[in-house]
Structure formats: C-alpha cells, structure tokens
Amino acid sequence: MAAPTAIRKSTEKSGINEQIQENSTLQSNQALDQNNDDEDMLIDTNAIPTTTVEDQDQSEPSNSLTIQQGETTELQLDESGKPKFSAASKSNMKVKLESRKVAVPPHRMTPLKNVWSKIYPPLVEHLKLQVRMNLKTKTVELRTNKYTTDVGALQKGADFVKAFTLGFDVDDAIALLRLDDLYIETFEIKDVKTLTGDHLSRAIGRIAGKDGKTKFAIENATRTRIVLADSKIHILGGFTHIRMAREAVVSLILGSPPGKVYGNLRTVASRMKERY
C-alpha cells in the first residue's frame, strides 16, 4: 500500500508545481501585455498629429494672408535709394491737458487790449488752444484741450504772447508760430560794459541812431527784429542772424563809430545774399 500513496504524493506535488508555473507564466504575460500597452500608448501619443484637418484648412488662409501682406508691405525706395516710409498718424497721439500763464507788464496792457483781436485768432484757429486775458491778474492764460494736436502748441503760444509783451510787433511775433527756428535773445547793456548816466544814454542813442536809422540798418542787414527797452535789448531771429546782430550792437556799445559798423553790415549783407 506504500507505493500507491507515494505515487499520489508525487502527482499532487507535480500538479502544484504546474499550477505555480502556470500562474507565473500568466503573471509574466500580463506584465508583458501591460508593457506593450504602455509602449503602444506612448507611440500613439507621439504619433497623433497636433493639427487636425480642420486646423489645416484654417491655417492655409492665414498663410496666404501673410504672403499677401508681405507683398503689399514691400520696402519702397526713392530716387536716391533711400527707403520711403508712410507718415505716422496723429490720431493715436494725445496731448496732455496743461495750462500756462504769461505775465503782461503794466505798460503793455493797453497795447494788448488794442490788438487783442489780432492775437487770439492764430492761437485758437492755428494752435487749437483756449485763450483768455485775465484783467485782474494781468496775465494771458493758455490751455490745451481735446482738439489740440500739436505737442508743442502750448510752448509756441506762450512764446508768441511773450514776444508781444517784450515790445515786438504782432506781425513779427506771429513768425514764431509759423517758423520753428526763431528765437528771442535778451541782454542788457551793462552785460557788455558798465555804463551809467549820460554814458548809458549815449550808448542807447548810438544803437538807435538818428530817427532809428542804425537800428533799422542792423535789422535789414541781419534779417532780425530789435527792440530797445531802456537798457535791455531784445533780438528776434534765427540763431546765426541773432549772432550777427548782437556783434553789431556790442560794437556800438563799446564805442565803435556808426560808419565802421555800417561797413561791417555791408559785408554781412553780401554774405547773406550769397548764402540765400
């Protein structure tokens, strides 16, 4: 009876071993399947195209648009080979709301009232500023508004009013609004030479001349405008023109005879004609 029982034990052991092997093979196959699935998933995610057919259809017109835009925005050159660019639009530019007060001396209030009808139209129509004359504070008030387009309009308007308060004529002061390269230079006689009493009066007389002939000669030769306000001298004009007029006035203050100054003005006038 011992042999049959021994055989049964061996068969039972072999069956158990087979079940263990089958379980291990199943587990290994499942692990391989999972790895294969993971690999398939990785391959699939990389293989999926990022753009669909609809996206491609939508992207094609955009490419054509960019090409068309590139064709329309070609660089244009002028005759000398320099690139030509279109002017920047002023619609996006905004001017800050600012105000400025220009003080008026007491002796210029009456002339300001008399020619006020000539002063405010260029400020309002040309520079698009708001202007008023304050009689209580004796100032001219300027202010920008939503219709102002020029950034430097307030400064130009203040220079125009300031030129009139210094003694320049309205027609001469309006040139400050039309031209950008005009300036006003002010200096005193004592800055050149310390003079008092009759010596100061004679220096002012030499600058003006008889009936203002010397002053007019300097203005016509140098294309400037000169105002003699007591011991102060105001010159309106371009940078180089102001320098020429200042040299003539300084030479008169230092005592040069008017005849010599006239000779120098003739040479200056001839040079000006050659330049322009």
Swiss-Prot record:
Domain KH residues, every copy: 197-249
Keywords: Cytoplasm, Nucleus, Ribosome biogenesis, RNA-binding
Subcellular location, principal: cytoplasm
A single Gene Ontology CC term: nucleolus
Gene of this entry: PNO1
Stated name of the protein: Pre-rRNA-processing protein PNO1
Compositional bias per record (Polar residues), positions renumbered to this chain: 13-34, 51-75
Gene Ontology terms describing biological process: endonucleolytic cleavage in ITS1 to separate SSU-rRNA from 5.8S rRNA and LSU-rRNA from tricistronic rRNA transcript (SSU-rRNA, 5.8S rRNA, LSU-rRNA); endonucleolytic cleavage to generate mature 5'-end of SSU-rRNA from (SSU-rRNA, 5.8S rRNA, LSU-rRNA); proteasome assembly; ribosomal small subunit export from nucleus; ribosome assembly
Localization per record: Cytoplasm; Nucleus, Nucleolus
Region described as Disordered: 1-39, 51-92
Keyword Transmembrane: no
Function comment: Required for small ribosomal subunit (SSU) synthesis. Has a role in the processing of early nucleolar and late cytoplasmic pre-RNA species.
Entry superkingdom: Eukaryota
A Pfam cross-reference name: KH_KRR1_1st
GO molecular function: rRNA primary transcript binding; unfolded protein binding
Family statement: Belongs to the PNO1 family.
Assembly with partners or alone: Component of the small ribosomal subunit, ribosomal RNA processing complex (SSU RRP complex).
PANTHER family, alphabetized: RIBONUCLEASE Y (PTHR12826), RNA-BINDING PROTEIN PNO1 (PTHR12826:SF13)
